[in-house]
Amino acid sequence: CGPSGAGHFVKMVHNGVEYGMMAAYAEGLNVLAHAGVGLSDRDLDAETTPLRVPEHYRYELDIPRIAEVWRRGSVVASWLLDLTAAALQEDPSLQGFSGQVSDSGEGRWTVLSAVEEGVPTPVLSAALYGRFASRGRDDFANRLLSAMRQQFGGHHEKKEPK
């Protein structure tokens, strides 16, 4: 597909695309996993996102089953979705995982190459930054954002019920 050595570059971009696809599956299934938010009462204040129509969010969905349906003939079907469905069958609540997502370097290299080439890659960049955020390295920044909100508007942190 190109001169000698180009294969490594092509594989690197392949892995960057993979980061984006994985993030899209994870985000979409996360929306479905939280589709029951309207089943319980929520405080309506400046610290929460009020549901305009709670009855639109009263679904208790079988996420492993949805992944299985999607992988069989859907436009989003792929080997990655096959693996996603298998993981959800094995551990539907994903309790065996911490949620810290490593990057092997290829996604990072893809984004750096895009910057050097002046080529926009918002999806691939967001997927890489999502992996960074999963490691808790944004905890200080998030605490600082909370502190600033309290300073300028007296906005105290809303504690999520456990």
How would you describe each model-predicted region?
Residues C1-M12, A23-L29, A33-K162:
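NAD(P)-dependent Rossmann-like dehydrogenase/reductase catalytic/cofactor-binding core
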Residues E18-Y19:
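Glycine-rich phosphate/pyrophosphate-binding beta-alpha loops
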